[in-house]
């Protein structure tokens, strides 16, 4: 088991310090064209569409377990990985991915503060070679513990351990 501990929102400098650490999986949620133009070293690209279920009339719901399992296995996710996710479009794709991980019970994750734009603007290393991870066999079970309604949020405003991701 890996013992990498990062805050929920990780600064670019802190991420750079652990880039070569076992158990770290960096996930880029940008379009593939943007990914190949530059990404955080070691990052794998994940298509945002693989996280979304095509279930009318509620388009944009979470994907089913088979679809999620295939997507997460495709990026080589293991249960003990610490995932750091980012995007550069400001669309919330990375936050939505982390929420998805929370819904399926994968608790070790962080969001790169400022996304890729901040990473690159601060002069951190950038690579253009696509990373192809070894596939894993990640099993997915959906839960509801990561869905918070207004009453839950109001009841936990003073809880320093509560983090709200608007995804």
Task: Annotate the PLM regions.
Residues 2-80, 154-167:
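Positively charged, proline/Ser/Thr-rich regional signature most characteristic
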Residues 2-4, 59-160:
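Thiolate-centered catalytic microenvironments shared by cysteine-dependent enzyme domains
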